[in-house]
Amino acid sequence: MRAWEEFLLLQEKEIGVDTVNKWLRSLKVLCFDACNLYLEAKDSFQVTWFEEHIRHKVKASLINNNGKPIRVRVTSLDKSTPFKETQIQQEKTAYFTMKYGDIDPNMSFANFLVTPENDLPVRILQEFAKVSEQGKGFPFNPIYLFGPESSGKTHLMQAAVGGLREAGVKTLYVTSELFTEHLVSAIRSGEMQRFRAFYRNVEALFIEDIEVLSGKGATQEEFFHTFNSLHTEGKLIVISSTFAPGDLKAMEERLISRFEWGISIPVSPLIREGLKSFLERRTEKLNIRIEETALDFLIQALSSHVKSLLHALTTLAKRVAYKKLSHQMLYQGDIEALLHDVLQAAESIRLTPSGIVRATAQYYGVSPESVLGRSQSREYVLPRQVAMFLCRQKLSLSYVKIGEVFSRDHSTVISSIRAISQKLEEDDRECDVSRAIQELTKRLSSAYQSLDFIED
């Protein structure tokens, strides 16, 4: 049909010919009337891709000769495909033996350093464990924890999960990425009923990094119904994210609204004194003695990055034990000698173009590949321009070098960077681009940044 073909040609310009051929032209046109187009996909995964990437474009661009929107209905061919009973059973077994979030026993409340900055989330999560022991309902639901990388969100989540499980509460702990993987597996194997039972027949659901669902319409739809089912039955939902609910990008408003139903709690990274106290406690447990100025040196050398410091102390403890120095006070010279390789590696850690691309992609809720890709869709063009601007600003790379990173000629790079500069020169601090640059600059320069954003 003509309208569908015109739509496909438009998409070739936005997302590329190869993508259209793979995902859209392979859809079979079953039937068309004035306002309805019926398509058949080869499998459920193609249906999911259509819903997440194309559905919103159809609503905006596909119209008939009378200017009325055409409703597109996509069904899956594999719904009617026969399977052998043994094959079905194998798929069920494979899907439901997937891991679903083991917790680290060391991540307990007892091992968490409570400071004035993070006292509130600790007290609330501990109180919830007590409430569950008494068989009472949860006073705030959901609990939404948000804060930068290395602020302790995972530690708090796992500590709370451990406490609830000890109290006999059936608790499921997953990352948003794992939730998405489970959903895709369920769709592909026709096991949505079992998927829903798996996620809803619990008393508490803990889900990390909810921003991973950004831009994934079909996954958000399923999580919306999962959330509603649990909340209606008074079951606890605990969510973590780098962003406050209102700052989530490409997330449905109805989900954001529900995230704000209960209580949203910021989780702050340890300030320097708190970090030092935390590390002093850790050295006692590891049975090593470090002179105060030597510990200050180590904190400075590793840029106050908590995970790097914990790794360094664990390595130091092993080497101290090997050299039988457990009772000896360690000074800066000893630290430099015993951790020479660790400190040398830390010096080589630097911000890179690929690190900027990953950080920008995460901020906008898209993949790094799409930022580096050829699509001219606005949802990818803007992150690409922002990443180019940051490469120029933060790394002082030449236009030619940036062009090599993004597989573009230098004139395209110049125009992209100029476009972002012009938006910033408008002096509107509330504009989306200005907020993006400010937030990404903060993340990339923060002493508590995640090593996901840097490479050695």
From Swiss-Prot:
Annotated spans, Domain I, interacts with DnaA modulators: 1-68
Renumbered residue ranges of the record's region Domain II: 68-101
UniProt-listed InterPro entries: AAA+_ATPase, Chromosome_initiator_DnaA, Chromosome_initiator_DnaA-like, Chromosome_initiator_DnaA_CS, DnaA_C, DnaA_dom, DnaA_N_sf, P-loop_NTPase
PROSITE patterns tied to this protein: DNAA
GO biological process: DNA replication; DNA replication initiation; regulation of DNA replication
Source domain of life: Bacteria
Annotated spans, Domain III, AAA+ region: 102-320
Keyword flag DNA-binding: yes
Induction conditions: In infected human monocytes transcripts are present by day 1 post-infection and last for the 7 days of the experiment. In patients with confirmed synovial Chlamydia infections, 7/8 had transcripts for dnaA1. In infected human Hep-2 cells, transcripts are visible from 11-48 hours post-infection.
Protein keywords: ATP-binding, Cytoplasm, DNA replication, DNA-binding, Lipid-binding, Nucleotide-binding
A molecular function GO annotation: ATP binding
Compartments, as annotated in UniProt: Cytoplasm
Pfam family name, one: Bac_DnaA_C
Gene Ontology CC: cytoplasm; plasma membrane
Region annotated Domain IV, binds dsDNA, chain positions: 321-456
Binding sites annotated in the UniProt record for ATP: S150, G152, K153, T154
Purpose: Plays an essential role in the initiation and regulation of chromosomal replication. ATP-DnaA binds to the origin of replication (oriC) to initiate formation of the DNA replication initiation complex once per cell cycle. Binds the DnaA box (a 9 base pair repeat at the origin) and separates the double-stranded (ds)DNA. Forms a right-handed helical filament on oriC DNA; dsDNA binds to the exterior of the filament while single-stranded (ss)DNA is stabiized in the filament's interior.
Description of how the protein assembles with itself and partners: Oligomerizes as a right-handed, spiral filament on DNA at oriC.
HAMAP family: DnaA_bact
Domain notes: Domain I is involved in oligomerization and binding regulators, domain II is flexibile and of varying length in different bacteria, domain III forms the AAA+ region, while domain IV binds dsDNA.
This protein's name: Chromosomal replication initiator protein DnaA 1
Organism of origin: Chlamydia trachomatis serovar D (strain ATCC VR-885 / DSM 19411 / UW-3/Cx)
